[in-house]
Amino acid sequence: MRTLQMQSCLHENGTVECALVEIDVPEPAHNEVLVQIEAAPINPSDLGLMFGAADLSSARLAEREGQPALLLDVPTAAMRAMAPRIGHWMPVGNEGSGRVVAAGSHPDAEALMGRRVGMFGGEMYAGYRCVPVEQC
């Protein structure tokens, strides 16, 4: 099964790209649950990861592999501070909530099957997220 996940990348040309990227939905391990995401807040830390030091007034719509994307320009003076991000696609979303749709074999994971949970652990701007049961 596949799902969409929001990711952000700073390109060498000084453009930040926020895009919906298609990924595989993972199978939960022994102590994990698979959650169908129903809600995820937007926090300042999420905005920092999505846009970095980009100039928000430069935002423009684009498309990546048939999915919507947003492009923003990073001022030249800010590129040095953001250099470690260049070329790295980074999943966005610190926390979220949703319903457990699959569980590993651990009793604590099985006990959450079908329940609505809140969780943290990053990568929450997606259709599904697999997390250790301790993060619920």
Task: Write out the residue ranges for each language-model feature.
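Extreme N-terminal starter segment of soluble prokaryotic enzymes
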Residues: M1-T3
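A structural motif shared across PLP-dependent enzymes of the aminotransferase-like
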Residues: G121-V133
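Cytochrome P450 core scaffold surrounding the K-helix E-X-X-R motif
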Residues: S45-M50
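Glycine-rich beta-strand-centered segment in the early N-terminal region that forms part
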Residues: P26-P41, A54-G121
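Generic structural motif
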Residues: G98-V100, R129, Q135
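Short polar catalytic/cofactor-binding loops
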Residues: Q7-N13, A40-I42
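Short glycine/threonine/proline-enriched tight-turn/helix- or strand-capping micro-motif at secondary-structure
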Residues: T15-D24, N94
